[in-house]
């Protein structure tokens, strides 16, 4: 014990239970999980209820992003909060400023996620099947993938789920999307008709 860091544990206050219950005051975030708490029955499943010193984890607790209010010390929901009370960089909320402007004034010290806008563009279904007629002007995303040589030659022992390369799916095109290749005689006939029409127009206009 010292004047700079006095030992205050032996001086309890009557309002401490209220602070722990309402604001999780002085509760260790790394405290163990309560073995009596049942997420289906709620706080009543634990004999100590909201006064329990251990953590009551909800089933949706680990599947959400980090709570914005908790990051600032302003969340009042405690363990009942539907967002994550944990500093996890992979589950941080998206930076609103970066998503709107394409840059962040707090970078590289920003605590929120900077998500590439291109990753939000939906995939092009035509490109996924093998060919997109719009090419580079397509508004959807074209993701380049390397085809599995073993699959292309007939068989891949790893299968689609475990193979790191792409296994293209053979899709039979619709009748309306089939390409028709003209014969040479059809092409030559069209050229002859165009030549005749050009000569006729020249005669009419007095160019010959």
From Swiss-Prot:
GO BP: any one term: mRNA processing
Impact upon substituting residue 142 to N: Temperature- and formamide-sensitive; impaired polyadenylation activity
KW Iron (keyword) present: no
InterPro entries the UniProt entry points to: CPSF4/Yth1, Znf_CCCH, Znf_CCCH_sf
Keywords: Metal-binding, mRNA processing, Nucleus, Repeat, RNA-binding, Zinc, Zinc-finger
GO MF annotation list: RNA binding; zinc ion binding
Subcellular location: Nucleus
Keyword Amino-acid biosynthesis applies: no
Reported effect, residue 70 to A: Temperature- and formamide-sensitive; abolishes cleavage and polyadenylation activity
Zinc fingers (C3H1-type) by residue: 28-59, 61-88, 89-117, 118-145, 147-170
SUPFAM superfamilies in the cross-refs: CCCH zinc finger
Pfam families: zf-CCCH (PF00642), zf-CCCH_2 (PF14608)
Record note on what altering residue 79 to A does: Temperature- and formamide-sensitive; impaired polyadenylation activity
GO cellular component, one term: mRNA cleavage and polyadenylation specificity factor complex
Family: Belongs to the CPSF4/YTH1 family.
Note: Present with 3690 molecules/cell in log phase SD medium.
Subunit structure: Component of the cleavage and polyadenylation factor (CPF) complex, which is composed of at least PTI1, SYC1, SSU72, GLC7, MPE1, REF2, PFS2, PTA1, YSH1/BRR5, SWD2, CFT2/YDH1, YTH1, CFT1/YHH1, FIP1 and PAP1. Interacts with FIP1 and YSH1.
Role played: RNA-binding component of the cleavage and polyadenylation factor (CPF) complex, which plays a key role in polyadenylation-dependent pre-mRNA 3'-end formation and cooperates with cleavage factors including the CFIA complex and NAB4/CFIB.
Name the record gives this protein: mRNA 3'-end-processing protein YTH1
């Amino acid at each position: 014990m010292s004047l700079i860091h006095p030992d205050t544990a032996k001086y309890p206050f009557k309002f401490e239970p209220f602070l722990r219950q309402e604001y999780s005051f002085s509760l260790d975030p790394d405290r163990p999980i309560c073995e009596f708490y049942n997420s289906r029955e709620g706080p009543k499943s634990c004999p100590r209820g909201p006064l329990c010193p251990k953590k009551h984890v909800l089933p949706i607790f680990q599947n959400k992003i980090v709570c914005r209010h908790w990051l600032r010390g302003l969340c009042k929901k405690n363990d009942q909060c539907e967002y994550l009370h944990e500093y996890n960089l992979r589950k941080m909320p998206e930076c609103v400023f970066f998503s709107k402007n394409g840059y962040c004034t707090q970078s590289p010290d920003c605590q929120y996620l900077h998500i590439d806008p291109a990753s939000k563009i939906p995939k092009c279904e035509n490109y996924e099947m093998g060919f997109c007629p719009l090419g580079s002007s397509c508004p959807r995303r074209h993701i380049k993938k390397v085809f599995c040589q073993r699959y292309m030659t007939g068989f891949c022992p790893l299968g689609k789920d475990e193979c790191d390369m792409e296994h293209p799916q053979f899709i039979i095109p619709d009748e309306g999307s089939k390409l028709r290749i003209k014969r040479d005689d059809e092409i030559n006939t069209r050229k002859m008709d165009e030549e005749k029409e050009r000569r006729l127009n020249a005669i009419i206009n007095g160019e010959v």
